[in-house]
């Protein structure tokens, strides 16, 4: 098991990539503290893990609040004795408006969820990792804002581009203390954030065609990439923006 006796926080864990990662990390021996806003769905994920013999506790809340980030760390320490890493996966897409039509409050909301929350969670998690002798932080980014973008993605692209810069800063500042930090950049993934692709076959076909593999990822596939970054298999990997995008970034046909 790649994460035997490790303790991880996973945010955005009520569905999609976060829920898949929660299941996968637990199957690989980790105790997981699960965060998300949707209390019922989050409890369902935690209950499923426990029923399968794993260790999981849910703590619902809003990642844009500094106190919540601190509470997640405190729960990891009180329930499982410490913290070895986190998959900071919570995210928000936005409404798809063009830049000139985007209300300032939407800009603020998207950046608060995708970028500011990453800083808040890192601030809370880093001292716990240093006290443990190091660990791994993973942040969900996107190919959007890194290698490509689409119309209507201004807020999202800016937030995800900024996230890569934050990850690099964390990697440089805390590497000597044993902390690794990486961004994981998925391509199109069949989650609620995929919008029409989840329910509209024509939209799904179009989005699949943007990828070299000509399909959309399953959440479990992205979770496997997160597991790699979380584990000692990636012991010399830090400060990266690792694409798991099915060739989206290179595909022009």
What is each PLM-predicted segment?
Residues 14-15:
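Conserved glycine-rich cofactor-binding loop
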Residues 93-96, 227, 238-253:
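Short C-terminal tail/terminal secondary-structure segment
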Residues 97-99, 103-111, 207:
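Substrate-binding pocket helix/loop in short-chain dehydrogenase/reductase
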Residues 122, 159, 167:
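Active-site helix of classical SDR
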Residues 127, 172-173, 235:
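Alpha-helical segment proximal to the catalytic Tyr-Lys
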Residues 175, 180, 237-239:
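Short, small/polar-rich loop/turn modules that mediate ligand/substrate recognition or access, typified
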């Amino acid at each position: 098991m790649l994460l035997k006796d490790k303790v991880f926080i996973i945010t955005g864990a009520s569905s999609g990539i976060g829920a898949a990662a929660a299941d996968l990390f637990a199957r690989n021996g980790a105790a997981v503290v699960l965060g998300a806003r949707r209390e019922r769905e989050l409890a369902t994920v935690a209950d499923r893990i426990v029923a399968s013999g794993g260790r999981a506790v849910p703590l619902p809340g809003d990642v844009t609040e500094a106190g919540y980030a601190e509470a997640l760390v405190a729960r990891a320490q009180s329930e499982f004795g410490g913290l070895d890493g986190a998959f900071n996966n919570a995210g928000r897409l936005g409404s798809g408006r063009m830049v000139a039509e985007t209300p300032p409050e939407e800009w603020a909301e998207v950046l608060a969820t995708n970028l500011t929350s990453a800083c808040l969670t890192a601030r809370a998690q880093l001292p716990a990792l240093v006290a443990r002798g190091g660990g791994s932080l993973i942040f969900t980014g996107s190919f959007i804002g890194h290698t490509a973008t689409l119309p209507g993605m201004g807020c999202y692209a800016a937030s995800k581009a900024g996230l890569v810069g934050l990850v690099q800063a964390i990697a440089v500042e805390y590497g000597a203390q044993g902390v690794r930090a990486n961004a994981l950049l998925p391509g199109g993934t069949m989650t609620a954030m995929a919008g029409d692709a989840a329910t509209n076959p024509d939209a799904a076909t179009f989005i699949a065609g943007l990828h070299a593999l000509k399909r959309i990822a399953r959440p479990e596939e992205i979770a496997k990439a997160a597991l790699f970054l979380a584990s000692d298999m990636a012991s010399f990997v830090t400060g990266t923006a690792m694409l798991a995008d099915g060739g989206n970034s290179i595909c022009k046909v």
